[in-house]
Curated annotation (Swiss-Prot):
Interacts with CMYA5. In cardiac muscles, identified in a complex composed of FSD2, CMYA5 and RYR2. Expressed in skeletal and cardiac muscles. Residues 342-437, 438-531 form the Fibronectin type-III domain. Residues 178-290 form a coiled coil. It is found in: Nucleus; Sarcoplasmic reticulum; Cytoplasm, Perinuclear region. Pfam families: fn3, SPRY. The keyword Signal does not apply. Residues 513-711 form the B30.2/SPRY domain. PANTHER family: E3 UBIQUITIN-PROTEIN LIGASE TRIM36-RELATED, FIBRONECTIN TYPE III AND SPRY DOMAIN-CONTAINING PROTEIN 2. This is Fibronectin type III and SPRY domain-containing protein 2. PROSITE patterns: B302_SPRY, FN3.
Amino acid sequence: MEEEAGEEPRLDRPTAPKDFHFYNMDLYDSEDRLPLFPEENTRLRRQTIQAEMTYDPKEVGNSFVDEGRMGVPAYPPYGIKRREPGWEQRDWRLEGEVETEDQDQDFSQWSMAGQSQALWESYRYTHGRASEEYECYVIPEEEDEEEAADLFCVTCRTPIRAVEKDFGEHKEHEVTPLSKALESAKEEIHKNMYKLEQQIIEMENFASHLEEVFITVEENFGRQEQNFESHYNGILETLAQKYEEKIQALGEKKKEKLEALYGQLVSCGENLDTCKELMETIEEMCHEEKVDFLKVSNETLGKFLKTKTDVEIAAQPEFEDQTLDFSDVEQLMGSMNTILAPSAPVINPQAPNSATGSSVRVCWSLYADDTVESYQLSYRPVRDSLPGKEQAEFTVTVKESYCSVTNLEPNTQYEFWVIAQNRAGPSPSSEHAMYMTAPSPPIIKTEAIRSCEEAALICWESGNLNPVDSYTVELTQVEEPAASGVTESVVGIPICESLIQLQPGQSYTICVRALNVGGPSARSTPATVRTTGSYFPLNKATCHPWLTISEDGFTVIRSERKNLTQELQPQQTQFTRCVAIMGNLIPVRGRHYWEIEMDEHLDYTVGVAFEDVPKQEDLGANGFSWCMRHTFASSRHKYEFLHNRTTPDIRITVPPKKIGILLDYENSKLSFFNVDIAQHLYTFSCQLQQFVHPCFSLEKPGCLKIHNGISMPMHATFY
C-alpha cells in the first residue's frame, strides 16, 4: 500500500487489529445509527466539509496574511482531499502506518466548520473574479481505484469485493450478494427483536403472576393463621374445662376422705377419754375397801372389755388413679385442618348460544378464599311426570369450574346443581339452575316451496316436541357451484313459514335454524329456490277423488272409472262436482306465468280462481273463477273464456297444444297464449281483491302437464 504512487498525504489512523471485521456503516441509514464516538464523529464531519475545498496556497497569495489580521485562522500549508469510504476502510486494514499526534492536533484545530465557511464566503466576496479563477484551478478529484464491497463472505462474516472472491483469500469461501446478506441480517434482527418482545411480554406476565402469588401467599397465611388460632383456642378451652371438672371431682373426694377421718378421730378421742376416766376410777377404788374394789373393778373392766373399739382407718390416704378422657380433644385435633370445607358454589345462569342439540356448557364460580379439589355436578331433566315418580339424576365429577355435559336430548330443559369438595369435606349444594339444550334442526317442506321472480314462501316442520322461541332462515346466493357463505339471514320468525324477498333471476340455497334460550339448532337440510319464474305445487287437499297426481307432482291424470254417476259428499276444500284441482300460488302481487301441456283433443278447463271458490260448481260458472274451457266433439274444437257463465265469441283456428297463462296483479289482467306459435288468445280484465290460485279440470279421461318456474316469454311481456 505504501508503494501506491500519486497519493496525496492523508491523515493516518490507528491500526485495527487483525481479527477486526469491518462493516461499512454507510450501508445503514444514518438516522438509524447511533453515534458510537460523538466527539470523533463531529470532528470527522468537519473534516469532510473542509475536504470539499481543495486548493493551492500559492494561488491565494497574501490573502492569508490579510485574513490572519482579521482573526480568521490560516489554512494548513498542505492540500486537503475529500476522503471516500474506501479510504476509511483501507486505513483500518493497513498496518504499520504511523500517525503523528501533532498533525492530528493541527488538523482538528484547523477544521472548524463555522470558521471555514465564513472564511470561504468572505474570500469569494472580497476577491470576486480572483476567487472564480481560483475555482478554475481546482484539480478534479480522482476516483478511488478500489471498488466498493459488493459481496459478503459468509465464512468470514465480512464484506468483500468481487475481485477478492475470484483471486483473494475468499476464493473457496461461501459468498452472497451484499444486499441479500443485508436483508437476511435485517430479517434475523427483526426475528430476534420479535422473540425479545415476546420474552419481555412473558417476563412481564410472569412478574405480574409472581405479584399475585405473593399476595395470595399473604392471604393464605393470614387465613391459615386465623384457622390455627381458632382451632387451638377451641382445644385450650376444652382442656381448661376438663381441668376444672377433674379438679372439682378430686376436691370432693378429698373432702369426703377428710370428713370420714375426722369422724373416726373424734370417736377415737371419745374412747380415750372413757379409758382415762376408767383408769382414774380404778385407781380411786384401789385405795378403798378391797372387797368392793374387786366387785366393781371386775364388773367395770368386763363392760369396758366387751365394748369393741374400731381401730381400722375409715378412709385411705391414697386417691384412685384418675383416667383422663381425651377423645373429644383428639377429635378436635383431628378436625384441625390447614384448609376449611368450601362454601357453596354459585352456579351461573345459562349463557346465550352456549348449547347444542345434545350438550350444554355449565359454568359456576367459587369464593376466592376456598380451596377445592373437585366438583360434583348433578343434573336431571325437567319434565311433566306422574305424581310420585321422580326423574333420574346424573352426576359428573370434574376438576374445573365448568363442564360440557353431553348426550342430552334436544330442546329439553335440565336442572343443574354443583357441590365443591376438598380434604375437609363437601360444601353445601349450590342453588339449582335451569339450562336448555338447543332445538333439533327443522325440516323444510321442499314439496311445498312456492316462489316467483321477487320472493319465495318457505314452509317447514319444527322437528321438536317442545315449542321453540323463533326460527332463522339463512340464504346463500349460488352464483357458482362452489360458492359458499350466508348472503342474508331472516331472524325472529315465530311460525313455521316465511315469505322472503329475493332478487330475480337468481338461485338460492335456503336453510332454517330453530332457536331457544340455549342457542340455535344445526342447519336444516338445504333446499334450492330459483327466481326465474313462478313456481307452485298442487294443492292435494282440493284434488277430486277421480284425479291422481304423478310422482313429479306436476302431471294431473284422470283415468277411466265405472261408477261415474256416484254422488260425492260436498266438501269445504275438495272439489266434488267439477273434476278439478288447484295449485298453491305464492301470495305476492306481481306477474306470474306458467304453462299447461295437453293433448289437443282433451276436454279441459284451466285458469285461476279464489281459494274459497265453490267446490260444488263448475269452474267459470261463478264470479270466483276466470277460465279457458276446451271441448272436442265431432272433429271440432270449441274454446270458451268463462267468467260467471259468460264467454266472448272467439274462434281459434290453431288448436294449442301448450297454453301459457299470465296473471298480472298490477294491471288486473289474466291472459292466455298459444305457446307454440306465440299467439295471444284472450285477456280478462278482472279486479282481484284477493289472491287467486291456478286451477285445472279434466272433463274426460286424459292427462295434462304443468310447467312452472320458467321465465316469461317475450311475447307475453306485451300484455
